[in-house]
Regions:
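Transmembrane and membrane-interface helices of multi-pass
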Residues: 2-224
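Soluble catalytic regions of membrane-associated enzymes that act on cell-envelope
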Residues: 207-255
Length: 255
């Protein structure tokens, strides 16, 4: 038993050692997972979770998209582009999380893709209010990135020359996809038809995570824009005909 534990400990240190590429990606993943939970409970007010299943889903839902995204960076063979890409991905994910924290503090809502596209107008509207919306925990959203970058620069975390094998990259990507389907299964058990019915955005974030919510909102935005661009002036006649044929007269008992 002791020998088995010792071997497992050695395997863990080797696998999750930040001085190799796989360990470095896991380090970024775990830190971002911790930041996401910090946002869930401090900035998003627990997202209305009311039972152990919902809390469990909230705890695991950040992993799927993160594993998928970081696994994509593992296909990069060259040393410097790999580490730069991984850090940039982490910065973008952290920025997305932080912007949603600021938005939720001000408007109790999450940032949609349309709002991101019109960020300059929103920022002008907020003005100096953006600074007043900052909180003490904001420091922790960026701390890991600063520390990891410094450790890379001073070579306390060494950049590994040997690339991640294609087999391991595909394995990591498959693990992320499997985690996503598992998350979807649990979410559907707790809240049936989550993706097909028009629930509040809070439900989507609570069950699937902030990253999945943003992707889902982006897909919906593209579909709506495509429908708008393909709409023709004579389409309104079909709408009017449908409304006219399905018109229900007012009940004389009440009107």
């Amino acid at each position: 038993m002791i020998l088995a534990l010792r071997n497992f400990w050695k395997w863990s240190l080797k696998r999750f050692n930040p001085n190799n590429r796989v360990g470095f990606l896991w380090l970024l993943t775990l830190f971002f997972w911790a930041k996401t939970l910090l946002a869930y409970f401090l900035d998003f007010g627990g997202l209305g979770a009311s039972d152990p299943i919902q809390f469990f889903i909230m705890i695991i839902n950040p992993f799927a998209v993160m594993i998928i995204v970081f696994s994509l960076s593992s296909f990069i063979k060259r040393k410097l582009p790999f580490y730069i890409t991984a850090i940039v991905i982490d910065i973008l994910l952290t920025l997305l999380l932080y912007v949603n924290c600021i938005s939720y503090r001000e408007m109790t809502s999450f940032v949609s893709v349309n709002q991101m596209l019109g960020y300059s107008k929103i920022n002008q509207g907020l003005g100096g209010a953006s600074i007043s919306l900052m909180r003490i925990q904001d420091f922790f959203y960026w701390l890991d990135l600063v520390v990891i970058t410094i450790l890379l620069v001073i070579k306390k975390i060494k950049m590994q020359e040997t690339p991640i094998t294609k087999h391991n990259s595909i394995l990591g990507l498959s693990l992320g996809i499997l985690a996503l389907f598992f998350n979807l299964f649990l979410a559907d058990c707790s809240r049936p038809q989550l993706l097909t019915r028009g629930f509040d955005d809070t439900y989507m974030v609570k069950y699937m995570g902030i990253n999945f919510y943003t992707i889902e909102d982006a897909v919906n935005t593209v579909q709506i824009d495509a429908l708008r661009s393909s709409a023709k002036p004579n389409d309104i006649s079909k709408v009017r005909s449908y409304v006219k044929s399905h018109y229900a007269k007012a009940n004389s008992k009440y009107y």
